[in-house]
Amino acid sequence: MKTAFRSVLALGLLLGLFLTASTALAADAKNVEATPQAKVYRASLKAIDTGDYAAYTKCMTSEAVKEIEKQTKEMGKTPKDGMEMMKMMAPSDIKLTDLKVDGKKAVLSATGKQDKETMYGTVNLEEEKGEWKVGKQSWTNKKS
């Protein structure tokens, strides 16, 4: 009788731990938006949408800013032109689905829409001078 009771108690504890862990994982997915990484990424999207180049560069890593300025110059475009191009190319309805942080680096996973097609994005972020910044990002229509 004691053995059966212990087995039921142990099973109950394991089930409780499993439910707690799975609830925590679900909560983590919902809380991606509350993270500093998501906030800086959303700020970069807002800057693109409004065409605010100064605000955009504040959200980006120093390396990403150098690359953007180099590409814009090579194309003979102004920063404003570059912002318009980014706005046209950016997916809409972006939903952040996952975040993995490893020290001063992080990767956001996202989905969005482009021409009515679901796109899957990976956004690399880095911590610079105590602030999270957006680095390179890539979007594809194939789920990885």
Question: Model-flagged regions — what are they?
Answer:
Residues 51-67:
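Short, well-ordered alpha-helical segments enriched in acidic and aromatic residues
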Residues 68-72:
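Short, charge-rich amphipathic alpha-helical segments embedded
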Residues 12, 21-50:
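Short, low-complexity N-terminal intrinsically disordered segments enriched in polar/charged residues
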Residues 27-33, 39, 74-120, 139-144:
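Surface-exposed, charged secondary-structure patches
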Residues 1-12:
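Bacterial N-terminal signal peptides that target proteins for export
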Residues 121-126:
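Hydrophobic/aromatic beta-strand elements that line small-molecule binding cavities or substrate pockets
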